Amino acid sequence: NYEIKLVGCPAEEIIPLSYENGGGGGKIKLINEGVFKNTAYSMMIHPATRNEVDPLMIAVKQIDIEFYGKAAHASGSAYVGKNALDAQILAYNNISALRQQLQPVEKVHGIITHGGESPNIIPDYTRSSWMIRAQETKDLKKLEKKILNCFKGAAESTSCKLNVVEGNGTYENLVTDKKLKKIF
């Protein structure tokens, strides 16, 4: 006695900054709301350029990073400021240096989404958005610690305050059921 359900999942992927207005992370929301409770098997169908029964879908997490400093006039009194943009740039460079030590399937992507208000003002606030990826969820957790250390080091060296804004959660890596794989 099995019941077959077809569940559509809009906004199923993590979209940078989307969690602020409720978008993205649809699969995580469905799981948290119990849509898959008492489900024996689950299949995912995703449009692609080719058919694959066992695709590599790695774990991913999205976070935003905020640095808070102290504004100052860049020409007249820069020495009294705490440059939040310097913190972002150092964090970005720390991660760039870390990349040579990462496994090929470990990925870190980031952009600065807010770098300041005016070039003649030392920025007191900056924000960046990051996606962290690894082959398995356990590896993602280890990689996230390394990435957070890059941000902490940048905050420490610039005397800025660091704030980590979590996304909708972690997408764990896809694990294909071997029995279903053979049947499909």
Enumerate the language-model features and the residues they cover.
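Proteins with a high burden of low-complexity, intrinsically disordered sequence enriched in S/T/G/P/A and R
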Residues: 1-4, 159-161
